Amino acid sequence: MNPEEQVVTWLISLGVLNSPKKIVDDPEEFLKTSLKDGTVLCKLIHRLLPGSAEKYCLEPKNEADCISNIQEFLRGCAVLKVELFEPHDLYSGEQFSKVLSTLTAVNKATEDQPSEGPCSHPSALSSAAGGAHTDSNSTASQSAKEMTENGSHQLVVKARFNFKQTNEDELSVNKGDIIYVTRVEEGGWWEGTLNGKTGWFPSNYVREIKSTDKPLSPKALKGLESTQLTKNYYPVVLQNILETERDYAKELQSLLGTYLRPLQSYDKLSAVDIASLLGNVEEISAFQQTLNQALEDVAKLPENQQRVGGCFMNLMAQFRSLYLTYCANHPSAVSVLTQHSDELEKFMESQGAANPGILILTTSLSKPFLRLDKYVTLLQELERHMEEAHADHEDVLKAITSFKSLVSQCQELRKRKQLELQILSESIQRWEGEDIKTMGNIIYMSQVMVQSGGSEEKEERYFLLFSNVLLMLSASPRMSGFIYQGRLPLTGMTLTKLEDAEGNEHMFEIAGNMMERITVSCSTSQDLHEWLEHLQRLTKGTCNTVSKTQSWSAHSTFGSTGQIRGPLEPPKILKPWSLSCLRPAPPLRPSAALSYKERMSYILKDSSKSPKTMKKFLPKRKTERKASDEEFVIRKSTAALEEDAQILKVIEAYCTGAGFQQALSSGSRKDSIPQVLLPEEEKIIIEETRSNGQTVTEEKSLVDTVYALKDEVKELKQENKRMKQCLEEELKSRKDLEKLVRRLLKQTDECSREETGRKSSLIA
């Protein structure tokens, strides 16, 4: 490997030179180009000797800037006592061999550095620095010696600036982080521990925390007795909580005083939009001032009487109320920021915000969420450095759990409110009736699983509760929108909470005179509680609790004494008990396996769904005998038609007579069972064309015919829906293709024009 390649490899390994994206054919030319402006050299000397090249131009624009950077590098190399080159030797590239010699000498002068810390504490470096650094080096050595002799005490520092690691053995720190220094060496690089990770960081990026007996974190001293360390480090963590709380309160005050309060008189936005941006920041700011003062008062007490966790728990109810309200409003504020970004950016910049001004407002409105997350981390750190016998230990654990729960609730609430806003602002497919915005505010919304009637199939639905109606939506197949699935009036609605035997389902049931029975499965117990609470309040009813098995049996058999019945349902007759009750019951007619209410709702109600569950309750019919050839004669004669008409008249008269008799008997004898038409037992003769083209006649029951027709209608609707969806997708694809073709044609036209222009210029 020649000297040029060695220097390139060295610079890349130190992280001061970016690795080339393709193979370099001429390393010397690559070095000349990379080092010409002096930026890489200044980074190099700052990497090797932190603080030696603090002022240099990152983006030199002229020769003077480049020469200045090179001179800054040469001044930093003076302490290494190596042969230097002239600045113009590098800038002009004429005497580049001298540049290589200097870089090689710098590499050799620093190659004795220990491998733990790159660019740090070389032994040769300390001797080369001369007498100017003798005092500082001896002080650092003395500090290192003291920490070695007394392992229970060490330097505790706080980061003044952000530092991002460039090598694996370095430590990334953020401003405000507390670092436990484990090793102090000459050269400006210290070793420390942060969040369980140990690495090197520049010493001029941190400041020492002024405190007596600064102990190591208990986790940094494995195998040592940590009780005393924990006790001594506790004040440092508490002080960090107070400082961050004080900073947060000041940020809220600044946000209100500088931007939000003046925004109230801004005439470019409506009062509703301004209210969405303000939210309850005023209340949160006042509350944080109260919390800050309470924590300050706690910190003044003796350590064994400090109840930081108790202070948080006393105010937890206010925390929950204020921050949940803020989270519920935040999606509306984001919507206003998006819709009026130009106006708000002008306003923010007029108030002194840096460009882009909208970014300041966006990040400021997100700080309450970040602060909630920070409380969990701060209290966990406090608990780690607190004795278990401390009077506040239990309250700190409770506060950690409470804040975790609050953070989770806030995240769920924000997602739900964002979804509500999306539903209200976008068009809903197959919507029926007046616009959704006229229904008022959404009281509650969540995603549930629904079972209709006695069906075993669960369907995913989005329930939206308004003041007088429960709206049902489903997600589109591509999750690009929502589809209208119906609405349930709250009038006459009854609720039943279902308790599953295994206890792993959160279910309730909705029923009523004007609706089909629906079983709803919630995702969590909290979601179930919210639905039952809101629905009971709006329906002004009560909620019964039954087991899941009892619920199904109650809907599939006749009711017991005192059971509420519908207006068309016959009363239940209680027979006195006798020995005859022990006899086997006679076989039920097929239709009697279903309750009266379900049979009538299936037959008489205009439903869009075929009651497949009824077929499950009915026993299979016996195999019908094969009809003779005489029965398959085509019936197209006038006599045959007249015969069919007579049969239909008989059925119609039977239905009318049964209904009339039921009306009379219900008026005179309320306890008697009215005559009920069982359409399943009534037969009709129909003509049907088989797949082979032959027309045959069959005898079918009325209920089977109705079901068959409903199934056919349902299939036709589904087919129509699929065709409509395919047509929409086809139209969308055609539009996308048209846009693509137009864009390609435009690009082709521009390329041809440029080519023509180049040819004409060459000819000229």
From Swiss-Prot:
Subcellular location field: Cell projection, Lamellipodium
Location of the Calponin-homology (CH) domain: 1-110
Cross-referenced Pfam families: betaPIX_CC, CH, PH, RhoGEF, RhoGEF67_u2, SH3_2
Chain residue ranges for the region called Disordered: 109-149
Annotated DH domain residues: 233-413
GO cellular component terms attached to this protein's record: cytoplasm; lamellipodium
Residue ranges, compositional bias (Polar residues): 134-149
Domain SH3: 152-211
PH domain location: 435-540
Keywords from the UniProt entry: Cell projection, Guanine-nucleotide releasing factor, SH3 domain
GO molecular function, one term: guanyl-nucleotide exchange factor activity
SMART domains: CH, PH, RhoGEF, SH3
BP GO annotations: intracellular signal transduction; lamellipodium assembly
Source organism superkingdom: Eukaryota
PANTHER family: RHO GUANINE NUCLEOTIDE EXCHANGE FACTOR 6 (PTHR46026:SF2), RHO-TYPE GUANINE NUCLEOTIDE EXCHANGE FACTOR, ISOFORM F (PTHR46026)
Entry protein name: Rho guanine nucleotide exchange factor 6
Source organism: Gallus gallus (Chicken)
Gene that encodes the chain: ARHGEF6
